[in-house]
């Protein structure tokens, strides 16, 4: 088996995904005791892992540094990359939502101002609804934007809704459901077809058996 390099995102999604790899027989002991390391070798397979920021996973896969990547669908929707999306892993499930303070009127004909970390997704969503909105990109916590009057509402990923609730915001619209996806480099799918499909097929069977 030729070496397969897999890019994972650090943090919450990583914790959801590692058990899936372990369940298909890939040793992840180094990943679970990583310290400050960012590159790891599976002890029982020719598979190595790299840990990068979520927004960079698809970039590493697109450019062939990684053969396979696991990343949230939000990243793929916001940043169009020339890769194959192979599998919905069914973990890290969240929703894109429009949220604001209780006095927000989503049916108002007045041009709205929306704060978000995801301007591309937000623009497409409102365009498809036939609404012209002003979009302000914010890198940090967007919840404060409608509270301070910077924006009428926000578009953000909601998992439990606790953060919104703690800041006095409510969900007005549920836009899209998202989850972790397995992506593959296009060239690698030709040169390492058997190895990649072996991982994808085993992962798919594991997901189906767990439903």
From Swiss-Prot:
Signal peptide: none annotated. GO terms for cellular component: cytoplasm. Pathway: Amino-acid biosynthesis; L-histidine biosynthesis; L-histidine from 5-phospho-alpha-D-ribose 1-diphosphate: step 1/9. Keywords: Amino-acid biosynthesis, ATP-binding, Cytoplasm, Glycosyltransferase, Histidine biosynthesis, Nucleotide-binding, Transferase. It is found in: Cytoplasm. InterPro entries: ATP_PRibTrfase_cat, ATP_PRibTrfase_CS, ATP_PRibTrfase_HisG, ATP_PRibTrfase_HisG_short. One of its GO terms (molecular function) is ATP binding. Catalyzes the condensation of ATP and 5-phosphoribose 1-diphosphate to form N'-(5'-phosphoribosyl)-ATP (PR-ATP). Has a crucial role in the pathway because the rate of histidine biosynthesis seems to be controlled primarily by regulation of HisG enzymatic activity. This is ATP phosphoribosyltransferase. It comes from Bacillus cereus (strain AH820). The gene is hisG.
């Amino acid at each position: 088996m030729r070496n397969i390099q897999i890019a994972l995102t650090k943090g919450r999604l990583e914790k959801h995904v590692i058990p899936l790899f372990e369940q298909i027989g890939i040793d992840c002991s180094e990943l679970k005791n990583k310290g400050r390391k960012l590159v790891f070798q599976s002890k029982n397979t020719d598979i190595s892992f790299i840990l990068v920021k979520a927004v960079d996973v698809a970039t590493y896969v697109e450019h062939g540094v990684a053969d396979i990547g696991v990343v949230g669908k939000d990243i793929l929707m916001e940043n169009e990359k020339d890769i194959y999306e192979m599998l919905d892993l069914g973990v890290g499930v969240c929703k894109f939502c429009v949220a604001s303070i209780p006095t927000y009127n989503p049916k108002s004909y007045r041009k709205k101002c929306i704060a978000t970390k995801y301007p591309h997704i937000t623009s497409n969503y409102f365009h498809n609804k036939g609404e012209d909105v002003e979009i302000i990109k914010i890198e940090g916590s967007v919840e404060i934007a409608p509270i301070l009057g910077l924006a009428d509402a926000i578009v953000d990923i909601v998992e439990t809704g606790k953060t919104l609730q703690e800041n006095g915001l409510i969900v007005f619209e549920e836009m899209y459901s998202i989850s972790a996806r397995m992506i593959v480099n296009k060239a690698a799918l030709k040169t390492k077809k058997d190895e990649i499909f072996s991982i994808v097929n085993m992962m798919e069977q594991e997901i189906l058996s767990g439903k």
